[in-house]
């Protein structure tokens, strides 16, 4: 009999504890009642009720894949004017990054020599001179890019903003493309 009374009392305790636990949690009061929002529903009349982006379909076209390869930051914009280029370079200098110029005759990564791109597959670009440590003039970077273009007219040229404290590349954008 002792066993059955113990079971009965534990069941009774569980039955009594369940409502107490549910009432211990306070209701969430961060949201407003749904009755405060007006609801207007149109009757369902077939396919006309399906969601549609309507006239915005023309905005969702992707870039053509032939002849318009894209690179890093800013490559989806038109070619930068000299003023825009100076502003971008001033931005990276203002952030304390070291400007560095790189060029490549390939411009695009390929997998001709191995399953993964390597040195001879356009993965690595050649540095033009040394990084411009201590450079505070954006015009000097543009002048170096023009000099690189004069030396290698068929090359892609990019500017890199290098953080020499964290030792990472922070920004990279194309400044010259071959004609």
Swiss-Prot record:
Example of a GO MF term: ribulose-bisphosphate carboxylase activity
Transmembrane segments: none
Keywords (A to Z) from UniProt: Calvin cycle, Carbon dioxide fixation, Chloroplast, Photorespiration, Photosynthesis, Plastid, Transit peptide
GO BP terms in the entry: photorespiration; reductive pentose-phosphate cycle
Keyword hit for Transit peptide: yes
Transit peptide per record: 1-58
Claim: Chloroplast is one of the keywords in the record: yes
PANTHER family the UniProt entry points to: RIBULOSE BISPHOSPHATE CARBOXYLASE SMALL CHAIN 1, CHLOROPLASTIC, RIBULOSE BISPHOSPHATE CARBOXYLASE SMALL SUBUNIT 1A, CHLOROPLASTIC-RELATED
Other information: The basic functional RuBisCO is composed of a large chain homodimer in a 'head-to-tail' conformation. In form I RuBisCO this homodimer is arranged in a barrel-like tetramer with the small subunits forming a tetrameric 'cap' on each end of the 'barrel'.
Family as reported in the entry's similarity comment: Belongs to the RuBisCO small chain family.
Name of protein: Ribulose bisphosphate carboxylase small subunit, chloroplastic 1/4
């Amino acid at each position: 009999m002792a066993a059955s009374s113990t079971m009965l009392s534990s069941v009774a305790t569980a039955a009594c504890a369940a409502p107490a636990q549910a009432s211990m949690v306070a209701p969430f009061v961060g949201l407003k009642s749904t009755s405060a929002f007006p609801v207007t529903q149109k009757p369902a009349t077939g396919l006309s009720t399906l969601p549609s982006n309507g006239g915005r379909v023309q905005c969702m076209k992707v870039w053509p894949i032939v002849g318009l390869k894209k690179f890093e930051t800013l490559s989806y914009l038109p070619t930068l004017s000299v003023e825009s280029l100076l502003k971008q370079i001033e931005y990276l200098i203002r952030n304390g990054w070291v400007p560095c110029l790189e060029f490549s005759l390939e411009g695009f990564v390929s997998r001709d020599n191995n399953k993964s791109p390597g040195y001879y597959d356009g993965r690595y670009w050649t540095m033009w001179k040394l990084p411009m440590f201590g450079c505070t003039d954006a015009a000097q970077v543009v002048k170096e890019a023009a000099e690189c273009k004069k030396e290698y007219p068929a090359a892609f040229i990019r500017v890199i903003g290098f953080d020499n404290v964290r030792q990472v590349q922070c920004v990279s954008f194309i400044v010259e493309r071959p004609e």
